[in-house]
């Protein structure tokens, strides 16, 4: 019986994040995982997307460069990793919470970074529990 290890990729920018988790053979090392992953990412660069950036400059004449995370087709990264023997872990339930949300302890409320009022389901549930704290129901 082959024992598997769990490996994870967290690719995060200010606006986006991608998390991938795979089962990998037990003999996997960090260096081997990084080598396989970097190979999959290079094979997944969306060259069509970045074509327009070759000519762009800002008002100061400096090159405008895209974020690396925006240049990668992450669905293809999964495909490439599967070709290398990694098995993506699929979850039945995934819950998201905003990394850029603020907690106002005076008002017992959560505020999203852009103050649009849009909260994730988890943040809304936390907000409801905080309201109960205000009224001593909780």
Swiss-Prot record:
<protein>
    <recommendedName>
        <fullName>Uncharacterized protein MJ0560</fullName>
    </recommendedName>
</protein>
């Amino acid at each position: 019986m082959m024992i598997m290890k769990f490996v994870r990729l967290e690719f995060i920018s200010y606006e986006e994040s991608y998390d991938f988790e795979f089962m990998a053979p037990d003999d996997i090392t960090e260096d081997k995982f990084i080598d396989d992953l970097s190979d999959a990412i290079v094979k997944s660069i969306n060259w069509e997307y970045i074509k327009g950036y070759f000519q762009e400059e800002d008002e100061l004449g400096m090159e405008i460069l895209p974020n690396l995370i925006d240049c990668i087709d992450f669905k293809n990264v999964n495909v490439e990793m599967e070709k290398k023997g990694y098995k993506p872990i699929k979850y039945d339930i995934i819950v998201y919470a905003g990394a850029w949300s603020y907690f106002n302890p005076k008002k017992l409320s959560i505020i999203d970074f852009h103050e649009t009022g849009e909260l994730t389901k988890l943040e809304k549930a936390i907000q409801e529990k905080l309201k109960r704290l205000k009224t001593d129901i909780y």
